[in-house]
Design a protein with these regions (language model features):
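Short metal-coordination and nucleic-acid-contact micro-motifs, chiefly zinc-binding Cys/His arrays
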Residues: 26
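Post-signal-peptide N-terminal segment of Sec-exported extracytoplasmic proteins
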Residues: 31-71
Length: 143
């Protein structure tokens, strides 16, 4: 009986663990601006510690949503990589961000995320603009 109780508790913990979900491009709506998410190079996602998933059509929507919901605890901050056309999600804290007037994003902030810092630097050299890490990006949008 004790083994069954332990197994049940373990199963409950695994079933409730907050996990990211794939974005259904062309179907899912942005939880900030309500536009349909179609751009695989600018999308983003948040997952709360309780497992609720929020999806965004642009990183700037995600950042603004975070600023308006500071009381919510998030377990995952995810963004897509501009250099990839696959639409896969990467940990936002590990990415590099470029704000460039020569590289537009869906909501007009000209904000693009890169999983690889060297590729971000290459785009900066070509397109100009300013590079940010996750925390400096939050500070930039808090102004």
């Amino acid at each position: 009986m004790r083994l069954l109780t332990t197994f049940g508790a373990l199963l409950l913990m695994v079933a409730c663990s907050p996990e990211p979900q794939p974005i259904a491009y062309g179907t899912d709506f942005c939880d900030f601006c309500r536009m349909t998410i179609v751009d695989k190079q600018h999308a983003a996602e948040l997952v709360t510690t309780k497992g609720r998933v929020y999806k965004f059509d642009a990183i700037e929507c995600q950042v603004q949503y975070l600023q308006q919901h500071q009381e919510v605890e998030f377990s995952h901050f995810l963004v897509t990589d501009y250099a990839s056309t696959e639409g896969g999600l990467f940990a936002a804290e590990d990415c590099t961000y470029l704000i460039s007037p020569n590289l537009s994003s869906p909501m007009g902030a000209n904000l693009t995320g890169f999983a690889d810092q060297k590729i971000a630097q290459q785009f900066q050299a070509e397109k100009t603009g300013e590079l940010y890490d996750w925390s400096s990006l939050q500070a930039h949008f808090a102004k």
